[in-house]
Amino acid sequence: MTAILVTGYRSFELGIFSEKDKRVAIIKKAIERDLIAYLEEGVDWFIFTGNLGFEQWALEVANDLKKTYPLKTATIFAFETHGSTWNDRNQQQLQQFRETDFVKYSYPSYESPKQLKSYHHFLIHNTDGAYLFYDSEHETRLSYLVAAMKEQPCYPLSFLNFERLNDIADE
């Protein structure tokens, strides 16, 4: 079994507030290419943390690829309360993560920063690498997870970046 953690920018961090935004189609095209490459290398699980934006689009692509490839998806939420204060539209989108092949919560609710560090440790030590849409020049709170990943020897990271998206848009 090979599992890849999939994470990246949330939609609002990219200034995307509608699924009809043309950038979403470009991002999904890149995701599809990358997930197919992973599948052809033998990856059989894609692991998500339940964030809207890149993860949501990757989950949608993965679900489409299930028609052709034998793959599984999992969501490991940091907290059982994840998304509980979101509006109805976002709650509906979050439901996709709750319907993956495997769903678990690390903690009932947030109590301290130590929980997030432990959660990151768990994600890294229970996956075989990560696929990220992240650029260190445009930092978000994802930087903590990326830093923890980079500290691990033999933990491969594959980045989708803005330059590659521009190339795909120009095709």
From Swiss-Prot:
Signal peptide: none annotated. It comes from the Bacteria. Pfam families: YpsA. SUPFAM superfamilies: MCP/YpsA-like. Belongs to the UPF0398 family. HAMAP family: UPF0398 (MF_01575). This is UPF0398 protein SEQ_1788. It comes from Streptococcus equi subsp. equi (strain 4047). The lineage of its organism: Bacteria, Bacillati, Bacillota, Bacilli, Lactobacillales.
